[in-house]
């Protein structure tokens, strides 16, 4: 099995987050790793509680992983600086799964062996689904900041909720439906095309729900085009779309591919407005200002919504928060801490079955005062909150409206 490089950040007793921790492979071990047999007992070591944070810290979607991890670490540092949870400090176990599902499971298992008692992660959809399946065996409290596939928290085929899993972001179906509603009801489009990557849970989930909702409203889907993993030339699909004369194109893909698609759309003469989901976050710099004009996408957070968070992020990392995944990481950490607080208040031992169940129960019934909005969780463990619609002005994403 291919080893992957991981990074581990620790919160010291003073609450200082290490910018770069010990580098290890997910399948390996380090001086702080607990044995598999002692993993539950090791969840609380003295006055610390071990919390796992995982995501793609390298690779094609590392901009999301870094953003989530930094956002989560920022909140956990603040908790530690304010005395921790009933006096206990939080120790972070951070792993880089490189955007790969197999590596993600390896990372999860490694952190369980090291004494993890709750998980913030994963970040993108496919690795998250792999970890969800593994986490059920441990009833591990798990909050993903940003994975949007419905199956992350709920299996529609069996009508089963993944009892230990929650998310801070909205779902793929929600995004697809919201953008179809916005296109038809707010922008007045009646003819739309779709271009998406086939075989990818996120892309296909948004595309399917956009199509179903748009048609249910009375709109016409004039064309649906797909492409495969690794494709970089989209001109054939875009030329076909051009010939069908849509008023808009829904492009539920990640920012790097979206940038290529917008550029190639311009080159073939397809200049209608494009729409997208939260995978567009980070798109600036991958497309020109003209290519971004009159485009819209949905997101959990809009810049300027919470100056306290934005100022704290800049003070901690020396730069502005990179995209909306940092606020989601912050809120995912806040959700986990909400559950940990309840378990600690009950006097339970970290890592035990009762402790983990107390964390899960508290989150399920709680109200989280997050920076992406105040939210509760519905029966599928998805957050109930509003959606930000963003557009681009001079190449920068700005809030158009809440919808």
Label the predicted regions.
Residues 316, 320-323, 337-399:
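Segments of small-molecule ligand-sensing domains
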Residues 1-50, 403:
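Short, low-complexity disordered leader/linker segments with a strong preference
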Residues 262-330, 397-399:
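Extracellular/periplasmic periplasmic-binding protein-like sensory domains
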Residues 61-86, 208-213:
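Short, polar/charged alpha-helical segment
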Residues 63-68, 82-154, 227-232, 264:
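Beta-alpha junction/loop-to-helix N-cap segments that form part of ligand/metal-binding clefts
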Residues 116-223, 273-297:
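Extracytoplasmic ligand/sensor domains, especially the bilobed periplasmic-binding protein
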Residues 53, 111-123, 143-145, 193-196, ...:
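Periplasmic-binding protein-like
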Residues 45, 52-71, 95-101, 123-124, ...:
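Extracytoplasmic "Venus flytrap"
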């Amino acid at each position: 099995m291919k080893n992957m490089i991981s990074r581990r950040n620790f919160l010291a007793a003073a609450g200082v987050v290490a910018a770069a921790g010990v580098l290890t492979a997910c399948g390996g071990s380090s001086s702080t790793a607990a044995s598999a047999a002692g993993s539950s007992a090791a969840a609380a070591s003295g006055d610390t509680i071990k919390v796992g944070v995982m995501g793609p810290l390298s690779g094609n979607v590392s901009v999301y992983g870094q953003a989530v991890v930094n956002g989560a670490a920022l909140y956990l540092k603040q908790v530690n600086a304010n005395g921790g949870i009933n006096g206990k400090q939080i120790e972070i176990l951070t792993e880089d799964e490189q955007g790969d599902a197999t590596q993600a499971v390896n990372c999860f298992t490694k952190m369980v062996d090291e004494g993890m008692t709750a998980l913030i992660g994963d970040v993108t959809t496919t690795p998250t689904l792999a970890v969800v399946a593994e986490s059920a065996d441990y009833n591990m409290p798990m909050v993903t900041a940003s994975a949007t596939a419905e199956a992350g928290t709920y299996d529609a085929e069996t009508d089963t909720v993944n009892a230990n899993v929650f998310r801070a972001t909205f779902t793929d179906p929600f995004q697809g439906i919201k953008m179809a509603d916005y296109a038809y009801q707010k922008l007045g489009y009646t003819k739309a095309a779709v271009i998406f990557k086939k075989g990818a849970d996120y892309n296909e989930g948004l595309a399917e729900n956009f199509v179903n909702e748009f048609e249910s409203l009375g709109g016409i889907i004039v064309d649906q085009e797909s492409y495969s993993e690794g494709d970089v030339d989209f001109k054939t699909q875009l030329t076909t779309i051009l010939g069908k004369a849509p008023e808009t194109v829904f492009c539920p893909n990640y920012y790097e591919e979206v940038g290529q698609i917008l550029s190639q759309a311009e080159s073939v003469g397809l200049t209608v407005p494009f729409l997208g989901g939260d995978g567009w976050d980070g798109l600036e710099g991958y497309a020109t200002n003209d290519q971004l004009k009159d485009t819209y996408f949905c997101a959990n957070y809009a810049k300027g919504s919470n100056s306290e968070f934005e100022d704290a992020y800049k003070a901690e990392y020396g730069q502005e928060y990179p995209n909306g995944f940092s606020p989601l990481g912050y809120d995912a950490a806040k959700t986990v801490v909400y559950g940990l607080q309840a378990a600690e208040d009950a006097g339970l031992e970290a890592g035990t079955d009762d402790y983990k169940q107390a964390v899960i129960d508290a989150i399920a019934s709680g109200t989280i005062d997050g920076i992406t909005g105040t939210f509760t969780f519905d029966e599928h463990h998805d957050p109930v909150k509003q959606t930000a619609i963003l557009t681009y002005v001079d190449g920068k994403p700005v809030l158009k409206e809440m919808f």
